[in-house]
Design a protein with these regions (language model features):
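Structural preference for solvent-exposed beta-strand-turn elements
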Residues: 1-190
């Protein structure tokens, strides 16, 4: 007896969100998303990435309470020349810290302004070309701060290791053929 079984598994939102940023950075068409098995966070990031190039004059992108989109888009928009956008979200999103990521991006010359409480969204970002020099994040409040920088090609040093940082490194390496992280517990390089 021959039996065939097809299972439609949901995609990994951790992988899909990273790939969406990498695709946008490299000018590739964004992964198609379906309404049936694509997590809401992935659809939200996909839609934001499609809209951002069309925006200007500080128009807002509402990211609900999606921390991944807020962190990854903060880095993405900061390095996107000509981008002029406000990233915002729910009241809960405006209580989620993002100061370490903004500080690291500002060290590279990013033009990011807090629209409310210092260290928290909403953020007004005016994108420009950023240098690819190393930054350090000590005890990051979120490994996504490190991943956001890695995704835009910024070398990072930190005192932590994480499977999510390792996943980002692997995806960047596979996507761009660059090794941007060394698991030495402290060094990430391009």
């Amino acid at each position: 007896m021959h039996c065939t079984l097809c299972i439609d598994l949901p995609i990994s939102k951790s992988i899909a969100n990273r790939l969406l940023i990498l695709q946008a950075l490299h000018g590739d068409s964004l992964l198609p998303v379906s309404a049936t098995n694509t997590p809401d966070d992935v659809r939200l990031l996909h839609n934001a990435l499609a809209r951002i190039p069309l925006l200007g004059g500080g128009e807002g992108v509402f990211l609900r309470n999606c921390g991944t989109a807020m962190r990854f888009l903060t880095a993405y928009c900061a390095q996107l020349t000509g981008c002029d956008v406000v990233l915002t979200g729910t009241e809960r999103m405006q209580q989620r810290p993002i100061g370490q990521l903004v500080a690291a991006l500002r060290k590279l010359g990013a033009d990011i302004e807090y629209m409310g409480k210092e260290g928290y969204p909403p953020l007004h970002i005016r994108g420009k070309k950023l240098p690819r020099k190393a930054v350090h994040i000590e005890n990051p409040q979120s490994t996504q701060f490190v991943s956001a920088l890695l995704l835009i090609g910024i070398p990072v040093t930190t005192n932590i290791t994480s499977p999510y940082i390792e996943m980002t490194r692997t995806l960047c390496h596979q996507f761009t053929h660059l090794q941007i992280y060394k698991s030495t517990n402290s060094s990430i390089e391009s």
